[in-house]
Regions:
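Glycine-rich phosphate-binding/hydrolytic loop that grips phosphoryl groups
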Residues: 189-197, 242-245, 250, 260, ...
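Conserved phosphate-binding catalytic cores of ATP/NTP-utilizing and phosphoryl-transfer enzymes
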Residues: 1, 113, 176-204, 315-320
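Short glycine-aspartate micro-motif
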Residues: 3-7, 57-62, 79, 123, ...
Length: 325
C-alpha cells in the first residue's frame, strides 16, 4: 500500500514516501512580536496539498496548541501558533482539571480565544484544519484535540461551546478522501515522535529535545500528578513536564552557560514524575549537543541512552501498521 507520512513540525515540514524522506521549511510568520505569532494558514495547506500524489493513505503528525478560526467554512484568522502567547495577561473565564490533559498557560487556545475579536463559528486545530480542507470534515485524534483545552480526556466529554469544535477520535482512523487517498486522523507531533523513538512497549522517561523540550513518562490508564496528563495511544497517558529548556535556547548559548541551568531544569522535572529506572533522550538536539547532555544526565544520576534517528515520521509508520490506536 502506498502511504504518505507528513510531519508538520515547528521548523520544517517533513514527509516520507516509499522510504525516502524530504523536507521543506515551515512557513515564516506573518506576525511575530508582542506575544503574537501567526502564520499564513493557506500557505501551510498549499504545501501539504502539493505533497499528495497517487498515494493510497495519508498520515499526519502536527504541532499542537495552535488553531485556525472559521466563519461559514472559510478561515477568518491566520494559523495562531503554539508560539503565540496572547493570553498572557488574560484572566481565564474557565477552569481546567487535570483530566483535560493540559494546563492553563499563555499559549492555550481556549484562553487565547478570549482575546479574539473576529466573528467565527468554528474552531480548528492545525491538524483538523488541514483535514477539513482536504475532506470537508473538521476532525482529529485526541492527541491533537486535547491541547486546545476543550476536551476532558478521562470522561471523553467535550465542552459545550457556541462554535463548532473538531470531532475528536480516540482511535486512529480514516476520516475521508482526497482524490484516491484516504486521509487519517492527525496525531500530536510529540506523541508521534516519542512513539517513533522508543516504540510501542517502552516503559521509562523520554526527554524529548526539539525546539521546545519536554520530559515525559508513558503510563497505563489515566494518571494524575504534577504534570500534564496528555493523551497517548492505546488509552495510555503521556505524563509530561513542559516548558523545559530546549533547542531554541540551547542553540544560542555555550555549554558552560547552560550546564547548571539544565541540571536544575531537568532535575526539577524528574522529581515531578513517578520514579523510573531508565531514560531515553531523543530529538534533533541530541545530534548536536550530546556531550553537554551526557554531563547533565550523569550529574542527575539517571540510567540513560540516546536515540538520534527516530522522529515523528517513524511514529507514523508504526501507526500505519495498525499496531496502536
Amino acid at each position: 500500500m502506498k502511504d504518505l507520512f507528513i510531519d508538520i513540525g515547528s521548523t520544517n515540514i517533513k514527509w516520507k514516501r516509499e522510504g525516502v524522506v524530504h523536507q521543506t521549511p515551515f512557513p515564516a510568520p506573518l506576525v511575530d512580536g508582542n506575544g503574537l505569532y501567526e502564520v499564513n494558514a493557506e500557505e501551510i495547506f498549499k504545501i501539504v496539498q502539493g505533497l499528495i500524489e497517487d498515494d493510497e493513505r495519508v498520515f499526519f503528525s502536527v504541532q499542537m496548541h495552535g488553531y485556525v478560526l472559521l466563519k461559514d467554512g472559510a478561515p477568518v484568522t491566520n494559523y495562531v501558533s503554539w508560539r503565540d502567547e496572547r493570553g498572557v495577561n488574560t484572566t481565564p473565564n474557565f477552569t481546567l482539571s487535570k483530566e483535560y490533559g493540559v494546563d492553563i498557560k499563555p499559549n492555550l487556545p481556549r484562553l487565547s480565544l478570549q482575546t479574539q475579536t473576529v466573528e467565527y463559528d468554528e474552531f480548528c486545530t492545525l491538524g483538523s484544519y488541514l483535514v477539513y480542507r482536504l475532506t470537508g470534515i473538521n476532525a482529529t485524534h485526541i492527541t491533537d484535540a486535547a491541547p486546545s483545552g476543550f476536551y476532558n480526556v478521562f470522561t471523553k466529554e467535550r465542552e459545550k461551546t457556541a462554535f463548532k469544535l473538531p470531532i475528536e477520535s480516540y482511535t486512529i482512523k480514516a476520516i475521508g478522501r482526497y482524490g484516491n487517498a484516504e486521509i487519517y486522523t492527525p496525531v500530536g507531533d510529540q506523541q508521534a515522535a516519542i512513539l517513533g523513538a522508543v516504540g510501542k512497549d517502552f516503559q521509562g522517561y523520554v526527554l524529548n529535545l526539539g525546539t521546545a523540550a519536554q520530559l515525559c513518562e508513558i503510563l497505563d490508564g489515566f494518571v494524575y500528578g504534577e504534570f500534564e496528563s496528555r493523551p497517548y495511544f492505546d488509552g495510555k497517558t503521556l505524563c509530561t513536564v513542559t516548558r523545559l529548556i530546549g533547542g531554541g535556547v540551547i542553540a544560542e548559548h555555550t555549554d558552560e552557560e547552560l550546564y547548571e541551568r539544565l541540571v536544575e531544569d531537568y532535575g526539577k522535572a524528574l522529581k515531578k514524575l513517578p520514579v523510573s529506572s531508565r531514560l531515553v533522550a531523543t530529538g534533533g538536539l541530541v545530534k548536536y549537543r550530546k556531550e553537554l547532555l551526557c554531563k547533565v544526565l550523569d550529574r542527575l544520576g539517571v540510567n540513560y541512552s540516546f536515540n538520534e534517528n527516530c522522529d515523528a515520521l517513524a511514529g507514523l509508520e508504526i501507526v500505519s501498521k495498525g499496531e496502536i490506536k
